[in-house]
């Protein structure tokens, strides 16, 4: 299934794409795509519904983040060896874990706000993993059983705040609008191998990132198992799993960063595309 949330910010309704790619309304069946709705049992109930029997959503509504009420938004850094090289950092021996504030979450086509005074706002196309069941101390072999599905994430990052100003990465990762998620939550059964997905990103039509999840340092299963040892993962938690090379700070001979008025387009094979315009934060 391709599940989504649509409507004005803060008033999103749950929906599903039908076989023709049209949005059907699910709000008579579930209040949101969150919590227990994301469990295997909850998704099975949705799967049993014939989309053709659901109300058709007219027009072109705003698409919100594909998961509601996200409890934890967990980032993984330097998870592609070639990205670590372009950043001038060693390939990690264990996952680099940081937090993205849930207040950064927005829809896949919402605008990106360039923070006041920022000259180093950067892009990162990433595979997002949505947890579907409470998960603590699971082993790698069973880790994917706890995944509800997958989505596209743009891990927008302000490099001065992330790297140059000391302390943790979190403060450069969590500005408002720095977490576009979606358009769809594609359920686990439709993604047979999360380590075989092409992902890409373009700025103003120029392709900067072109990678595949097979080159991850730590696989999705390894990340879920690892994180479950140091925290309890809950339904609706989102893990964004790192980015392939081609970020702005790695461009040679001189880094390239986002400016107001640009168009960012990104996508992952089978998971949909995002389209954002950049603007100066007010």
UniProtKB/Swiss-Prot annotation:
InterPro entries xrefs: FAH (IPR051121), Fumarylacetoacetase-like_C (IPR011234), Fumarylacetoacetase_C_sf (IPR036663)
Domain of life, source organism: Bacteria
Any GO MF annotation of the entry: metal ion binding
Record's keyword terms, sorted: Hydrolase, Magnesium, Metal-binding
Listed GO biological process terms: urate catabolic process
EC number: 3.-.-.-
Cofactor field: Mg(2+)
Binding site for Mg(2+): 124, 126, 155
Family: Belongs to the FAH family.
Designated name of the protein: Putative hydrolase Bcenmc03_4750
Organism (species): Burkholderia orbicola (strain MC0-3)
The organism's taxonomic lineage, starting at the top: Bacteria, Pseudomonadati, Pseudomonadota, Betaproteobacteria, Burkholderiales
């Amino acid at each position: 299934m391709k599940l989504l949330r649509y409507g004005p910010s803060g008033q999103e309704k749950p929906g599903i794409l039908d076989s023709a790619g049209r949005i059907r309304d699910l709000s008579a069946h579930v209040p949101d795509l969150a919590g227990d709705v994301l469990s295997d049992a909850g998704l099975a109930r949705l799967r049993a519904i014939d989309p053709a029997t659901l109300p058709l959503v007219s027009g072109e509504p705003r698409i919100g983040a594909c998961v509601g009420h996200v409890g934890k938004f967990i980032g993984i850094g330097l998870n592609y060896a070639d990205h670590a090289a372009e950043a001038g950092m060693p390939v990690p021996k264990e996952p680099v874990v940081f937090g993205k504030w849930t207040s950064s979450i927005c829809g896949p086509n919402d605008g990106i706000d360039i923070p006041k005074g920022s000259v180093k706002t950067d892009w990162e196309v990433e595979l997002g993993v949505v947890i579907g069941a409470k998960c603590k101390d699971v082993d790698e072999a069973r880790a994917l059983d706890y995944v509800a599905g997958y989505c596209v994430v743009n891990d927008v990052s302000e490099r001065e705040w992330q790297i140059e100003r000391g302390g943790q990465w979190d403060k450069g990762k969590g500005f408002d609008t720095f977490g576009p998620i979606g358009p769809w939550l594609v359920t686990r059964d439709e993604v047979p191998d999360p380590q075989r997905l092409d992902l890409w990103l373009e700025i103003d039509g120029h392709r900067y990132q072109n990678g595949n999840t097979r080159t991850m340092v730590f696989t999705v299963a390894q990340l879920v198992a690892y994180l479950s040892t140091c925290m309890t993962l809950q339904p609706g938690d989102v893990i964004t799993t790192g980015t392939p090379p081609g970020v702005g700070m790695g461009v040679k001979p001189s880094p390239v960063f986002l400016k107001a008025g640009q168009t960012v387009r990104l996508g992952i094979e089978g998971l949909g595309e995002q389209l954002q315009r950049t603007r100066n934060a007010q």
